[in-house]
Amino acid sequence: MKAEIHPDYHTIKVVMTDGTEYLTRSTWGKEGDTLNLDIDPKSHPAWTGGNAQIMDRGGRVSRFQKKFSGFLKKD
């Protein structure tokens, strides 16, 4: 394995949506940084079986719905 071509692999803290925290090793951020999750297995509809709306970050979903709202309408 070549030296000094791999990203730094260090310990970070991950905070889930319910406040649960755990330490893991990652190449994300710097040593000791905290990663706050917006969606995780405890809140994502795919894992919870719910049909909850996923938070529209940056208005992307809203813009898409507005742009294509009448595309498949049948009169």
Swiss-Prot record:
Keywords: Ribonucleoprotein, Ribosomal protein, RNA-binding, rRNA-binding
Assembly information from the UniProt record: Part of the 50S ribosomal subunit.
Family assignment from sequence similarity: Belongs to the bacterial ribosomal protein bL31 family. Type A subfamily.
Function (record text): Binds the 23S rRNA.
Protein name: Large ribosomal subunit protein bL31
A Pfam entry, by short name: Ribosomal_L31
SUPFAM superfamilies reported for this sequence: L28p-like
Keyword Transferase attached: no
Species whose genome carries this gene: Bradyrhizobium diazoefficiens (strain JCM 10833 / BCRC 13528 / IAM 13628 / NBRC 14792 / USDA 110)
GO BP annotations listed: translation
GO molecular function: rRNA binding; structural constituent of ribosome
Domain of life: Bacteria
GO CC, alphabetical: ribonucleoprotein complex; ribosome
